[in-house]
């Protein structure tokens, strides 16, 4: 058995799990998420916990049991608490402003960058240089944050660009004569 899949996923109060064939749906206070469970993984619910077992003992099935457990754990955490990712803009004149489903960015280009947020994702700008991405889908929150960072990744000489709040940018020394 996978070491990850050995640990059951505890269901907090207010979170419902439904099975429909291989379709697993998790419903909570913040929304609903769905997952197609691999055919080699068996999911059972007992006393407020979800358990994941590989149907046959081969390596692929054990790996899929662990992967499914991790994905479902993220779904349960997402619908109950949600996920957020914080970005910082470092540079003169770099600004961000959230307007509904569009994030307006001024990143030193000759034109403003307008990023359309996907469904289920919200962005807040507590200050002009901070962006807070929130949502219930961990993968989608991280993907949106990475796409925004890709507009102007931090450069190694001055550190200017869009970076994650907890990111440490490796700095290089300027060329000497």
From Swiss-Prot:
Entries under PROSITE patterns matching the protein: RIBOSOMAL_L6_1
UniProtKB keywords: Ribonucleoprotein, Ribosomal protein, RNA-binding, rRNA-binding
A Pfam family: Ribosomal_L6
Record SUPFAM superfamilies: Ribosomal protein L6 (SSF56053)
UniProt-listed InterPro entries: Ribosomal_uL6-like, Ribosomal_uL6-like_a/b-dom_sf, Ribosomal_uL6_a/b-dom, Ribosomal_uL6_bac-type, Ribosomal_uL6_CS
GO (cellular component) term, any one: cytosolic large ribosomal subunit
Domain of life: Bacteria
Keyword Ribonucleoprotein attached: yes
Molecular function per GO: rRNA binding; structural constituent of ribosome
Gene Ontology BP, a term: cytoplasmic translation
Function of the protein: This protein binds to the 23S rRNA, and is important in its secondary structure. It is located near the subunit interface in the base of the L7/L12 stalk, and near the tRNA binding site of the peptidyltransferase center.
Subunit structure: Part of the 50S ribosomal subunit.
Family: Belongs to the universal ribosomal protein uL6 family.
The protein, known as: Large ribosomal subunit protein uL6
Organism of derivation: Pseudomonas putida (strain ATCC 47054 / DSM 6125 / CFBP 8728 / NCIMB 11950 / KT2440)
Gene name linked to the record: rplF
